[in-house]
Amino acid sequence: DAAALSAFEVVIKSPGISAYASPKVDAELHGVRFTSGTAIWFAENAGAHTVCVTGTKGKSTVTALVAFLLRAAGERTALAGNIGLPLLELLDVQPPPDAWAIELSSYQTCDAQRPAVAVVLNLFPEHLDWHGSEARYFADKLKLVTDAQPGIALLNGADARLREVGNALAARGQRVQWFNTDDGWHVRDRWIMRGGRAVIDVKFLPLPGRHNWVNLCAAMAAVEALGIDPVPLAQPFLRRPHLPQ
């Protein structure tokens, strides 16, 4: 409880403990400072090459796909955060990975710092008991792009709320890129498209359902945002030998 926590100067908080309720709020009144495994990792790995992914739905799939594609590109890539190993267990990995694919929940997004690419997939009300309100949940989720100072904010252009946020970010100088738009990576007529170019027939994908095809679009866009052509990297993922020309 708050009284017990007041015996400590700094407490490493589990993500599942709400930032907006007791015991954290009450302990802070007694001068206790809180941090998290996520915050510690980013502070200790300020130069890490990270792709951070959040969203109400699909973030585990997209993070895993990003790691798959980067590994196919020859990048030693760690899968971490809300998927794979907890960040606190990866403070001093030797040799360090070339890249990190990190899944972040709404409990963790406020602690990320300067990812190379920050991906927000979608927003639906969730975890309201932790956040206290729908508005606060959305705001906390969006801290990955509004507060974390990403190199590139990659957003779902088909989500009206994310479109509004992205336009506001771009107006203040943030680099913003989009997926799920006609000029980017998107799904059309059972094809994965890059703008007007048909790239992958979805019948060759082991991922069922349109939502997963959009997830693949997000991952392809994230890798592309790093300056890597994702098309040849998807080759081992398909159930046939060659991508269409």
Regions found by a protein language model. Give the residues of each.
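Adenine nucleotide phosphate-binding catalytic loops in nucleotide-utilizing enzymes
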Residues: 5, 131-135, 167, 174-245
